[in-house]
Design a protein with these regions (language model features):
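Acidic, proline/glycine-enriched N-terminal capping motif
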Residues: 1-53
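Acidic, low-complexity central loop/insert segments
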Residues: 3-5, 9-12, 54-143
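Short glycine-/aliphatic-rich beta-strand segments at the starts of folded cytosolic domains
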Residues: 5-27, 93-104, 185-196
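Short, conserved charged micro-motifs
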Residues: 19-24, 74-78, 119-124, 199-204, ...
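Short, intrinsically disordered, mixed-charge
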Residues: 25, 29-33, 75, 79-87, ...
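Glycine-centered loop/turn motifs
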Residues: 38-39, 87, 141, 146, ...
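Anionic-ligand-binding alpha/beta catalytic cores of soluble enzymes and soluble regulatory domains
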Residues: 114-194
Length: 256
């Protein structure tokens, strides 16, 4: 399944200056020092307590980096960068124009960069609100800031965990992230739920007792509902049977 998704409304910043690599290395979870020209990496900007302030894609573009973030947090992301850049030789240039992302399947959605330019000839970029985009997004565990992740969450509780480089040097929020990793005691994690019945579940709906968890996103898919939910470690194992809003559900690892 190939989906070409319109990302023209996303915020994109070109980062230049002599301190660009050191600055981003010390502020984001992305190991920018490892990015070769043309490569990209997903990650986050954290607060000092290790909570997620922004989800970003960082792409190496010659002697610069391009940072992309959702439209809803584009201004906040730029403000964060500028706040930390007081004594650094860095400059931020907003980029505009068409952009898109290509998803071939849920397993590779997080590998897809944000690409500047028009859609390939003969293809039409779908809006983010397209039901097919939402179904694949949920199967991939592709986060929406303010919906599936926010200032209450650690990156290791989300699919961003796969991008955390524990061999990287210091960055803002690193200590609590490394501490929990070393102790191995995360309490919650984002998982997929396949729920009986084709009626979406309201965000914030709690799982039925005794399971502990909360739905963040959901979408009807055939005669069932697919959802993302933060589950407590006592019920997050793939294949576990839980219930939400009186409906039976099965836990799935992400992507699925």
């Amino acid at each position: 399944m190939r989906l070409l998704i319109d990302r023209s409304e996303w915020g994109r910043l070109r980062v230049t200056g002599g301190d660009r690599t050191r600055f981003l290395q010390g502020l984001t979870t992305v190991n920018v020092e490892k990015l070769a020209d043309g490569q990209h990496g997903w990650g986050a900007i954290l607060n000092p307590k290790g909570r997620v302030l922004s989800v970003i894609d960082v792409a190496r573009d010659g002697d610069a980096y391009v940072i992309a973030s959702e439209a809803s947090i584009a201004q906040a992301t730029r403000a964060l960068l500028e706040r930390y850049a007081v004594m650094d030789d860095v400059a931020f240039e907003p980029l505009s124009g068409p952009a898109h992302q290509v998803w071939d399947d849920p397993a590779t959605a997080w590998d897809a960069p944000i690409v500047a330019g028009e859609a390939p000839s003969g293809e039409v970029a779908r809006p983010e609100t397209d039901p097919e985009v939402e179904r694949l997004r949920i199967r991939a565990g592709f986060l929406r800031y303010g919906v599936d992740v926010g200032e209450d969450h650690f990156p290791f509780e989300t699919p961003l965990a796969r991008f955390l480089d524990y061999g990287k040097g210091c960055y803002v929020g690193q200590e609590p992230v490394f501490r929990v990793h070393a102790q191995g005691n995360a309490a919650h994690a984002l998982r997929g739920l396949l729920i009986e019945g084709a009626a979406p579940i309201a965000p914030g709906t709690k799982l039925d007792a005794p399971a502990k968890g909360e739905v963040t996103s959901s979408v009807a898919d055939g005669d069932a509902t697919r959802a993302l939910a933060y589950l407590h470690r006592t019920c997050w194992e793939p294949g576990a049977a839980v219930a939400v809003a009186g409906r039976r559900a099965t836990v799935h690892e992400l992507p699925w």
